[in-house]
Amino acid sequence: MANTKGPIIQVTDIVKHYGSVIALNGVSMHVSAGEVLCLLGDNGAGKSTLIKTLSGVVRPSSGQFLVEGEPVNFTSPRAALDAGIATVYQDLAMIPLMSITRNFFMGREPLKGFIPFRHVDFKHCNEVTREEMHKIGIDVRDPNQAVGTLSGGERQCVAIARAVYFGAKVLILDEPTSALGVAQTSMVLKYIHQVRQKGLGVIFITHNVRHAYAVADRFTILNRGQTLGTYAKSDITMDELQNLMAGGKELQQLSEGLGGTI
Amino acid sequence: MALLEQKTTAAQKVDERIKPVSLLTQLMRRPELGAVAGLILVLVFFFLTADPTMFSLAGLMTIMAPASQLGILAIAAALLMIGGEFDLSIGSMVAFAGLVFGVLLTNFGQQLAVAIVLTMLFAAFMGAINGQIVIHTRLPSFIVTLAFLFILRGLTLVGLKWATGGSTQLRGIGEHVKDSASLAIFSGDALKDAFVWLADQDLIDKFPNGMPKVSGIPVSVLWFAALALLATWVLLRTRMGNWIFAAGGDPNAARNSGVPVHRVKTGLFALTACAAALVAIITVLDAGSTDARRGFQKEFEAIIAAVIGGCLLTGGYGSAIGAFFGAIIFGSVSIGLTYTKFDSDWFQVFLGSMLLLAVLFNNFIRRKVTGER
């Protein structure tokens, strides 16, 4: 990957305390354009706190947070969004009863006309939605159909397409495949691959090493609020990754005990 | 219907690759379908059973007057329901706003215009309080506004006794507002000249002296129609409309997408209370007095009209024009039965059945539309 510029997002020694609880204890990571960084870690490792910090939901207690080399201090999710960091949450992305178009433009409706008659240009919205869906290979017969009619994978793709359309430089995907079946998962993974080729940085959070290994360029493993290490794909096998993620030894012992089925 | 067909052809022009969506699917996707079908059913029923005078101009006005007063509440209740909340205090709010309005006019001798503005501001404030309590306590709005149903009704009684020295009715409002310039906007009939002209042209029934039998359209009907159009436009065409659907559909997803959910909901509560105040002002000016039973049980009727109009109880889905038709169904049945041989006490039976049917139908349609299983 030809990265002439530095990383888009770089965090160094991020610490976050919730009262007396230390959620993040000096986490460092970075992601560049055209790269998929996979964030792995068991429950309680600090993945969600790290995502919340990156997406402006919580503010770090200390540490350095650079976006394109400039130090930032986000006060709201909106501020992170404006800086080009878009987060797609696993189940809170779409409203099933609303149309695809209305979901796509939710919170960022393009306006037309003067103030008492100012309205949303839904004709334009429908065209854009149909076009964007077409690009990612989802055949939307009618952008006015409810999102509830789409499959889980398609919904994730719509949410990602929305973030891309609105100019995200970095996509944070919070377990986008955890609730999906096999076919749906491959659809989402394929789309993540497409997004990378467009030159966006992707931070992909998952439990599933197999999904991670399929698309990621690098892996950062979190454990108990700290970075356990960052590995390029060429430096690590899927088994090693699995062991690192689940705390190494224990799982290996368990695996042997179960006859190597995990 | 013509509008829908136009839309389809426009879409075909834009992109010929897209298969046209069948008219039936488009219709099914409209939340107000049930209400329109219901209204047709009701009208056919009365065509067959009622005295033909029901469908005269005078008969229609008799139906539309109560329908419009309920409808103003129902449209606001529909918007609030789409936004994901209920307001059970609107009926009591009508009584309380009526008291505030009456006291401002009589006890404080305010001008009509001033009294109207102050009553509206006061109602908006009370609505916003409702909203703030619901938002900050995260209690269901059902229970918070149920509390206000009793609080406001009780305050109305106490306030009326205080204002009148022991009575539960405040009279003499008519004399205070006789000469007010703004009276015509909130009271009586509108378009009187047009009706005189229509009578001259022999287009409508008239008395032997040449005056029309129906002197005009009650102003409440015009308010009702205007609000229905405005609310429909806001819902379907504006950013605020999208935010209302989003806030009711899934507040978390909406917030993550940058929708100010709390502001939207607070605004809707204030709007609902203002609609109650508007009904209070119109009915108090018409009656020339206000009493403690004003708006009694209107909260249920408004919610029923909204549900018949296609609103889901869980929020995020519904229509204002549906509530418009829901309110007209309500008015047609309550008044229409007096034109038939049936006992008009069948009204409530009919209403309950209608509500049950509407809810079943809405659920069915929602599953169809969203592919929910």
Residue ranges and their predicted role:
Chain A
Residues 2-262:
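Glycine-rich phosphate-binding loops of nucleotide-dependent enzymes
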